[in-house]
Amino acid sequence: VTSAVCHLVVGPRKHGVVEYAISVHDALVHGALAHGGRVDFGTDHRCAFLESPDAELPPLDCSLVHIHVTDRLFGRTPGEATERFSALVDALGTDVSVTLHDLPQPSDGAAMQARAEFYRTVVRVAAGVIVSSEHETALLQNVVDDSIVPAMVPLMIGTRPPRRRLSTPTAPTVGVLGFLYPGKGHIETLRAMEDLPISVGFVALGTPSPGHEYLADELRGVAARTGRRIEITGFLGDEELERRIHEVTVPVAYHRHLSASGSINTWIAQGRKPLVPRGGYITELDDRSPGVVSIHADDDGSLRHAIASAIDDSTSTWIDTSVEPVPSPSDVAAAYDEHLTRWTR
């Protein structure tokens, strides 16, 4: 008998965690439809959407509901998020499993304890817990609840398209991908360009996250003082984002407190090899999938040197065609199917 898992996707479609939740379900469906239509997975994976956690629930007929969770999708504060998540679980009335994102860590400062309390509430009601890196496993056990042993399924790296030979832009650019928010590294990257020729522009592929619109003004202010070209693209659709990722001369992901990163994987999925600071998660990523990132020491001076070197040799910012990034969508689908099927029993 086929059991059903409902992937309940909570939040606005443009949010990174929501996009990832959809991509996991898509991979499960495509995996199930592979090989001439034969269903490979014994579990029926369905999908339902909630624009917000207190929206009206669609009818679900499932033995397990799986939700991708970050506190910011459930409330403006961790306390509000806890109330709304708990109310949703009560309304579902069935077993719930979760994938945790953006786990609390010491770099959160004063917010860490309240955020940890939210995640504690989540894991204590969950029939199963997935995280996306060993680094996140350590955060979960050190900061949230040391009794939880999660399943670890790394973030998928989309299928890499054939490398495009674009004509080199007349003026080179350094690019940062994703929402603008504190700690993402936009300002630090722009400042690290101060020794570069003024002809090298800075581009932020994305839009400020809610409440952080001031960061765009800060970036423009720093650029204006040095006379450097700057562009903040705003939200980009898939095709436009793909084109812009290929146009950037030097991709940079100077996010100092990573526990897993969708934006790094987006660069990689397009054949780019971003500059990244050495750290626990980056070491794990490099061990699992060698040759997909360019690692420098975790300080501003090393970033400055790495950018200058990449401007001089832009071929270093493309993944060698012999490298096959892992895990693929089908790898991730198989792992999710295994864990979710186990938790339905």
Question: What are the residue ranges of the model-derived segments?
Answer:
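Membrane-proximal helix-turn-helix segments that form the acceptor-binding/catalytic region
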Residues: F85-A91, A111-G128
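Short hydrophobic beta-strand element within catalytic cores of glycosyltransferases
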Residues: K273-R278, T283
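Donor nucleotide-sugar binding/catalytic pocket of nucleotide-sugar-dependent glycosyltransferases
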Residues: R124-P162
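Nucleotide-activated donor-binding/catalytic signature segment of Leloir-type glycosyltransferases, i.e.
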Residues: A216-E242
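A conserved mid-protein helix/loop that constitutes part of the nucleotide-sugar donor-binding site
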Residues: E19, Y181-D195, N265
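Glycosyltransferase donor-sugar binding loop
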Residues: G201-D217, G234
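A charged, aromatic-enriched C-terminal amphipathic alpha-helix characteristic of glycosyltransferases
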Residues: D298, R304, I311-T344
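Acidic donor-binding loop of glycosyltransferase active sites
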Residues: R243-S259, R272
